[in-house]
Amino acid sequence: VENEETATSGPTKPEVALPDGDAPTELTTRDLVVGDGAEAKPGGVVRIHYVGVTFATGKEFDSSWERDEPFKFAVGGGRAVKGLDRGIRGMRVGGRREIVVPPRLGYGKQSPSSLIPAHSTLVFVVDLLSTTT
């Protein structure tokens, strides 16, 4: 039996404020809101809302909010960008976290769209809506 824990309050799309200074070379996370629900762990299936911007410009390149459809994936399953997958681990349902992803854990040399140049550092603000345990 899988238990799914869902956040009760409906979050709204966040504004992404770029961190100060140079782009970090390592994955960095900062909890903007600490959730009090179940913890996202490898093997669990999470539902998140997110906004992604490039560190260099602050321009939004993707947002699940615009589609009104949360992104659902298995933690550690390879469906999400590596840095995003690693960055949500330990996060709790109801939380909001800023995740700064260096190129090697993002798209690297690839440019998946005109909005994401090669070697881009990515900034995500993620709301963890639910996770299975």
Which residues fall in each region the model found?
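Cross-family detector of peptidyl-prolyl cis-trans isomerase
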Residues: 1-133
